[in-house]
């Protein structure tokens, strides 16, 4: 029985260690390398003494953001990822609600204005897995995985809490319903702070597939996106109807 989403990664690493997991522009990362980097980040997070605490991620859609998400999950804490272009005032409102114990961000995004401990993405490569710390982490399926912030009916940030179990059950349902296999090549359109991205990310990891990340800028050129899908042999997309209509027209 799966108790946390990191077990999806562990199982796929055992089967497909050298297979490409994520592709972003000219950058790509294998299952084994991704597991190593996210475990190393988890170890660094654990050095802060955090357990089941909120961690705020302020990063653009990237492989580094995914390492941050899985690193937080592996450490037994839970994350909230937000738009890196969000105005300072709104970020502060989210911080006041979430009360993060740690922020993971990039140095050029100005998050050092917040009086909260930081980990910067350019430090990831310097971290090493600490098996002693990692072995002490205990996660059950009802533990929180992430908090998704929406505008809410009043325009004020509203956090929606999602457990490991919710994502595990959803991922199993998607995999079975759409017969997703390890030979699938998916493309992610939704930002990571939208719940549509959950299908792309965790279904890919669970099934041993490959996920390509496309930026908002790239989606402004439909002809180039279609050519990208052809060139890379994409077999599965999960896009909202408005995007599909946009491409059809």
Region locations from a protein language model:
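Hydrophobic packing residues within well-ordered alpha-helices of enzyme cores
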Residues: 68, 111-113, 174, 198, ...
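Short, well-ordered alpha-helical microsegments
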Residues: 64-66, 88-91, 197, 222, ...
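Carrier-protein-dependent adenylate-forming modules in NRPS/ANL systems
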Residues: 1-165, 178-179, 208
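Acidic donor-binding helix in nucleotide-sugar-dependent glycosyltransferases
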Residues: 64, 71, 184-185, 200-203, ...
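Conserved AMP-binding/adenylation subdomain of ANL enzymes
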Residues: 158-187, 195-236
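Active-site beta-alpha turn of Rossmann-fold NAD(P)-dependent dehydrogenases/reductases
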Residues: 59-60, 148-151, 184, 190, ...
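Adenylate-forming
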Residues: 60, 108-109, 190-193, 217-218, ...
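Short hydrophobic "strand-cap" motifs at the C-terminus of beta-strands
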Residues: 25, 82, 147, 189-190, ...
